[in-house]
């Protein structure tokens, strides 16, 4: 009887001693899971290059937003990840450096019009296939190349809504999401999403757009709400790195996102020192470190 009581007491004491450590580890994991920090491969000058993973690791990023490759006047993206050799190489290298893929970007549509591409479905399907290869869920589709004024032009707008509905449903059928970037304000984006009416289309929110248009960044986030935002480009235009940026109160951003209940990837696109723009390690290393201080 005494031996049994002694053993029970000993086990209890061990558990009591160990509990704070378990609680700390568990809490740390949850905190890290709430917000992860990624960099864009094309902005660190490693568009679809194998060296992007090592560089992202050296920058202390959690992940990488990979690009589909340049588009220009080509019929298709210059995408290495259609080839089995590169698929295996990229996956193995990402694992080696412990870098997750936050998303796959179709950045070619910054310059090319999504409305003027007859093969838009094939281009998006190529991206969806790449999401499967790299085991991630979010595709990034900027609408910067669409002719300005589409927002008020009923014919252009209806064509765009139709196309986005089609590709959104393609994505949803595969359990994926396409995050679109527009120049609309938050209320305008809510209305656009309602018109598209597809679970496969959400907003890829970009701080720079809100700030450049003189909008209240924190209010815009609240209007969109957590369920309409799939991912965030959490940077401003080039000028200063984030810790010196006077237009963004990053702690207020975190409080806003916390209250919204949003969690996910914060992706660093710009916010480079204008006097040293091509110094990748300085600009992106500084921004990663700052964001981790605030969000993790």
Q: Predicted segment positions?
A:
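Bacterial N-terminal signal peptides that target proteins for export
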Residues: 1-9
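Bacterial N-terminal signal peptides
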Residues: 9-20
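Histidine-acidic metal/acid-base catalytic patches
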Residues: 23-38, 45-62, 173, 186-296
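Active-site-proximal loop/turn and secondary-structure-junction residues that shape catalytic pockets
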Residues: 43, 68-70, 107-110, 143-147, ...
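Active-site acidic/histidine proton-transfer and metal-coordination neighborhood
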Residues: 57, 93-97, 110-203, 211-212
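Conserved beta-strand positions in the central sheet of alpha/beta enzyme cores
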Residues: 65, 103-105, 140, 179, ...
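Glycine-rich, proline-tolerant flexible connector loops at the mouths of alpha/beta enzymes
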Residues: 67-91, 143-151
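Charged helix-capping and loop-helix junction motifs
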Residues: 80-87, 117-125, 153-164, 216-222, ...
């Amino acid at each position: 009887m005494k031996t049994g009581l002694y053993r029970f007491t000993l086990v209890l004491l061990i558990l009591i001693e160990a509990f704070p450590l378990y609680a700390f580890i568990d809490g740390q994991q949850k905190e890290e899971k709430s917000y992860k920090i990624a960099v864009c491969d094309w902005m660190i000058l490693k568009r679809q290059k194998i060296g992007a993973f090592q560089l992202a690791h050296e920058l202390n990023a959690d992940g990488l937003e990979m690009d589909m490759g340049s588009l220009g006047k080509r019929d298709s993206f210059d995408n290495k990840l259609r080839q089995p050799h590169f698929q295996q190489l990229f996956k193995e290298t990402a694992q080696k450096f412990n870098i997750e893929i936050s998303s796959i970007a179709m950045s070619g549509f910054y310059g090319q019009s999504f409305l003027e591409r007859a093969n838009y479905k094939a281009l998006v399907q190529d991206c969806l296939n790449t999401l499967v290869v790299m085991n991630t869920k979010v595709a990034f589709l900027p609408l910067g190349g669409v002719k300005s004024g589409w927002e008020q032009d009923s014919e252009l707008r209806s064509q765009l809504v139709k196309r986005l509905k089609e590709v959104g449903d393609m994505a949803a059928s595969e359990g994926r999401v396409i995050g679109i970037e527009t120049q609309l304000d938050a209320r305008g984006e809510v209305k656009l999403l309602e018109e598209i009416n597809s679970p496969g289309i959400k907003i890829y929110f970009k701080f720079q757009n809100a700030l450049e248009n003189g909008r209240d960044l924190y209010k815009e986030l609240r209007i969109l709400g957590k369920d309409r935002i799939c991912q965030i480009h959490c940077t401003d235009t080039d000028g200063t790195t984030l810790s010196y940026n006077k237009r963004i109160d990053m702690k207020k951003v975190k409080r806003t996102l916390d209250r919204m209940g949003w969690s996910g990837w914060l992706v660093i696109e710009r916010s480079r020192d204008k006097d040293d723009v091509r110094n990748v390690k300085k600009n992106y290393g500084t921004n990663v470190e700052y964001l981790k201080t605030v969000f993790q």
